[in-house]
């Protein structure tokens, strides 16, 4: 009986760990627009390329696929499709997420700020 109780408690604890793990909560797009200031030094929120590629329609787009932008081979061959999970990892630590990419940005460590920024990027359609 004691083993069954221990097993049940362990299963519940693991369930909570999975539910509360690294899953990002929905962000606030209005706050994300403010966070985008960090991105706007290199990226436009429309189709225009600058130092970085334009981010219009970035969510759902294959990485390294904006016409007219000169991507690193690492980015072009990454097989990443930008979604909440891949954007979160890349925005948190670009070099860790995709070693050898050429984006000279250290990343955003704050999970809430990343959630907000991703929510804003989702509005760029």
Label the predicted regions:
Residues 1-28, 114, 120-125:
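Post-cleavage N-terminal segment of exported redox proteins
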Residues 14-16, 55, 103:
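Bulky hydrophobic/aromatic "packing anchor" residues in well-ordered structure
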Residues 27-50, 55:
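Sequence/structural segment immediately N-terminal to covalent heme-attachment motifs in c-type
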Residues 37-47, 60, 92-96, 122-125:
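Sec-exported extracytoplasmic/periplasmic mature domains
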Residues 52-53, 57-73, 92:
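Solvent-exposed helix-loop boundary motif
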Residues 67-88:
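Short Fe-S-cluster ligation motifs
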Residues 83-125:
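C-terminal capping alpha-helices of c-type cytochrome domains
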């Amino acid at each position: 009986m004691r083993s069954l109780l221990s097993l049940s408690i362990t299963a519940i604890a693991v369930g909570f760990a999975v539910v509360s793990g690294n899953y990002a909560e929905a962000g606030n797009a209005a706050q994300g627009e403010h966070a985008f200031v960090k991105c706007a030094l290199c990226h436009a929120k429309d189709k225009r390329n600058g130092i970085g590629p334009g981010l219009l329609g970035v969510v759902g787009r294959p990485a390294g696929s904006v016409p007219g932008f000169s991507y690193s081979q690492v980015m072009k061959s990454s097989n990443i499709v930008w979604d909440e999970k891949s954007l979160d990892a890349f925005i948190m630590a670009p070099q860790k997420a995709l070693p050898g990419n050429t984006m000279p940005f250290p990343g955003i460590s704050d999970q809430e700020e990343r959630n907000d920024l991703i929510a804003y990027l989702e509005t760029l359609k």
